[in-house]
Amino acid sequence: MVSPGAHDGWLVGSSADAVAHSPAPCLLSPLTAGLDPHLATMACVLPVGDVNGSLRDAAAAQPPPDGTLAGVLAHDPFRRTGDLLAELGARGVHSIVNWPSVAPLSGELAAALEHSGFTYQREIDLLREARAGGFRVAAVVHTRDQLQVALELGPDRIVVTPGLTTADARERRRQGEATTALARSAQQRSGNPVWLHLHPGFAEWLEGSVPAGVVVLRHAAGSSGA
């Protein structure tokens, strides 16, 4: 059950799904919305699937409702950012978020990706370019350091994600509590709407503890992950 004063939002795979959930907030990410959440968090920051192509096709089939966040992969080796943003804008996309993101990754995996150019800063650069092009932007964050970087950009909203799950229940609880605290800090410091990704692996620790006013980003029925 969502905390009193919090609001439901939805991760969706099509603009039609976003329309069906309207006026609730939605994040449109066709590829990640259909994957297991544990796989998608790690794999979708890599060009293993055409994240941006599926987003472009979804917007072409039906423009997403105004206010829907369109999840753009910043680390797309096959498209120029400017061309992609222009294409999305022409298809009725008005709001961009760096999703999927390397933000929740850590340790050796994060270090290897950063060495290959898959950096959080690159995602912030994408958002900066999108905002210069007239888009509203939202920034995904997982740590306080990332929140500071995101706030310097001045996004229209912050999306807090709990990161990768673990089999250790105590560690999941610690991460869940840290995520709630980060959402509260983002809300206080940004002065803008904050969304919290309710990753199924952390639902037991996040449900009922979300700060009032935060949008809880849930998985739409029929979708298994993000």
Residue ranges of model-derived segments:
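Conserved N-terminal beta1-alpha1 strand-loop-helix module at the mouth
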Residues: 1-67, 90, 152-154
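Hydrophobic faces of well-ordered beta-strands that scaffold small-molecule active sites
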Residues: 4-13, 25-28, 68-72, 96-98, ...
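Structural alpha-beta junctions
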Residues: 5, 64, 90-95, 132-134, ...
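Catalytic cores of alpha/beta
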Residues: 14-22, 79-90, 144-154, 189-214
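Glycine-rich phosphate-binding active-site loops on the catalytic face of alpha/beta enzymes
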Residues: 24-39, 91-106, 154-171, 207-226
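Alpha-helix-loop-beta-strand connector modules within alpha/beta enzyme cores
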Residues: 40-70, 112-142, 172-201
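Hydrophobic alpha-helical segments and helix pairs
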Residues: 65-109
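Histidine/lysine/aspartate-rich catalytic loop segments that bind and position anionic ligands
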Residues: 99-169
